[in-house]
Amino acid sequence: LTERLSQLGAVTREARELCQTSGLTHFQSRITVKLGQKADAASLVPFLHPTPAVGCLPRDESTLDRLRDYRRQLKVPSFFGAPFGFIEPGGETTHLVVAIRGMAFEGNQVRLPSGCGIVGGSAIDHEWRELRLKREAVLRLLGLQS
């Protein structure tokens, strides 16, 4: 991500830290980009999405096509994970976060897709545990599980 963003200007990445939410602990990395030239928020989105957390590496058309195909097969909403944010009054500063969650409503049903990022050093049993914990936390938040 920082490599991609460096095409836009000077990138500063703070140390990864833990972010505690109700029931889950997430890793958080704050990244600041001092743009080389003025850009609007919409032009920044392709640099932010999809990240390796919800996307693929290498990030080329072939792997993105494969990712889209897998998501269709698994019935994952196409908007699962995306940049989210706001522009400060005056338009000089934009705050964006890369959201890796989603919710899709269809009739009287709701889909809450979840996943985990698999990389070379991943331990599959840890990834399954993380996935289970994520799903349970969301179910508790919605009052569907105690």
Predicted segment positions?
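Glycine-rich, small/acidic residue-mixed loop/short-helix segments
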Residues: G55-S146
